[in-house]
Design a protein with these regions (language model features):
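Conserved alpha-helix/loop element of class I SAM-dependent methyltransferases that forms part
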Residues: 4-20
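Alpha-helix C-terminal capping/helix-to-coil transition sites in glycosyltransferase folds
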Residues: 19, 80-81, 107
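Class I SAM-dependent methyltransferase "Motif I" SAM/SAH-binding loop
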Residues: 27-29
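Class I SAM-dependent methyltransferase SAM/SAH-binding core
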Residues: 32, 36-73
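Short conserved loop adjoining the S-adenosyl-L-methionine
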Residues: 73-79
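A short SAM/SAH-binding and catalytic strip from SAM-dependent methyltransferases
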Residues: 84-96
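S-adenosyl-L-methionine-dependent methyltransferase catalytic module, highlighting the catalytic core
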Residues: 98-103, 110-202
Length: 202
């Protein structure tokens, strides 16, 4: 099921990107998304990844990748050097997510961010009825070994963009194998029933 969710997320991200664009994938993991974008959309893609094993997998696939920490390495990229910057389910793991977002918006003409939605109804129910930090398919780690430092909801990210005058171009909610557009008028209900939020901002 996790692979299905990941494939759906990557398909949504790929659909947001035009053919032949230049993309930086921050926290690119093993390069699965980069590989998809390169093969399906002829995208010139580069990755930034901290984990050495993931970097080796990217290299093995013939994908251009730099090993480094996004919180300390993004300043090296010139302004507007990519058409898009992608950050997939990583924002919540940074110590200073606002600073990272500022760098992404500086580096890319547009930015695509996906987040696990802490406002999903099953997450809320776990906290409400059991009084425990939730463990779900999109939040698979227990509280004591999770990489997540700053959990947020789809609504939180909407509000953040409003406060910082960041233009929201499109938001897609993902739930299992279904997707739906999220607007301000349906934000409350989509925040409740979407496991994942994918934002196109810039």
């Amino acid at each position: 099921m996790k692979n299905l969710k990941m494939k759906k997320e990557f398909k949504v991200i790929a659909d947001l990107l035009p053919h032949n664009s230049r993309v930086l994938d921050v926290g690119c993991g093993d390069g699965s998304l980069m590989d998809l974008l390169k093969k399906k959309k002829n995208i010139e893609v580069r990755g930034l990844e901290l984990n050495q094993d993931n970097v080796q997998q990217c290299i093995h696939k013939g994908l251009p990748v730099i090993q480094g920490n996004a919180e300390t390495e993004l300043h090296q990229f010139p302004d507007q050097s990519f058409d898009f910057v992608v950050l997939s389910q990583t924002l919540q793991a940074f110590y200073k997510p606002e600073k990272v977002l500022k760098d992404l918006l500086r580096i890319g003409k547009s930015v695509i961010i996906s987040i696990p939605n802490f406002g999903y109804w099953k997450v809320r129910a776990k906290l409400l009825f059991f009084g425990e930090m939730p463990v779900t398919k999109t939040l698979p780690n227990t509280w004591y070994n999770t990489p997540n430092l700053h959990m947020c909801t789809i609504k939180d990210l909407f509000n953040f963009c409003d406060e910082k005058n960041i233009i929201i171009k499109k938001v897609v909610g993902v739930n299992e194998n279904k997707t739906s557009l999220i607007k301000k008028r349906n934000l409350e209900i989509k925040n409740l029933f979407s496991k994942l939020g994918i934002f196109l901002i810039g």
